[in-house]
């Protein structure tokens, strides 16, 4: 069985709390709100999966590549997210995490159900590739060294 912990605050908070109460999900969905980074780190350490179902806002607003996904991948937490904006640049579908279409609750539920059936041997290579992706492609020190090498070659 899954337990969900939704961190942060935002425009959907009131609606989510209402839905949790309406569907009597208080025993499986927790919304602790905003937490300082050291508490978020402790919560990540306890997580089995990191879920970030990003969607395009009604005004067309999109986030780029969420740092929260990078952080989860870097510390070895499997990620499930959406085919949204720059996320596929970070999460390679079925290789370094799992992606579902935006606004597709059924696909998200199916992905989480499938995730729950994976064993450690199946997760290990995905977690390894995710960490390698973040360490190589999104590590500021690596990027700076590569840029310095390019500039020296000019």
Regions from the language model: what does each represent?
Residues 34-35, 42-47:
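Short alpha-helical donor nucleotide-sugar binding micro-motif in glycosyltransferases
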Residues 45-61, 77:
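Acidic donor-binding loop of glycosyltransferase active sites
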């Amino acid at each position: 069985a899954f337990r969900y912990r939704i961190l942060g605050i935002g425009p959907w908070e009131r609606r989510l709390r209402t839905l949790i109460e309406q569907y009597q999900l208080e025993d499986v969905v927790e919304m602790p709100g905003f937490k300082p980074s050291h508490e978020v780190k402790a919560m990540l350490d306890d997580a089995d999966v990191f879920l970030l179902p990003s969607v395009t806002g009604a005004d067309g607003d999109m986030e780029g590549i969420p740092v929260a996904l990078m952080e989860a991948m870097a510390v070895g937490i499997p990620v499930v997210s959406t085919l949204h904006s720059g996320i596929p640049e970070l999460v390679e579908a079925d290789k370094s995490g799992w992606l579902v279409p935006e606004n597709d609750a059924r696909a998200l539920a199916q992905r989480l159900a499938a995730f729950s059936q994976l064993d450690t041997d199946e997760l290990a290579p995905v977690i390894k590739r995710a960490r390698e992706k973040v360490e190589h492609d999104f590590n500021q020190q690596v990027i700076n060294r590569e840029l310095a090498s390019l500039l020296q070659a000019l």
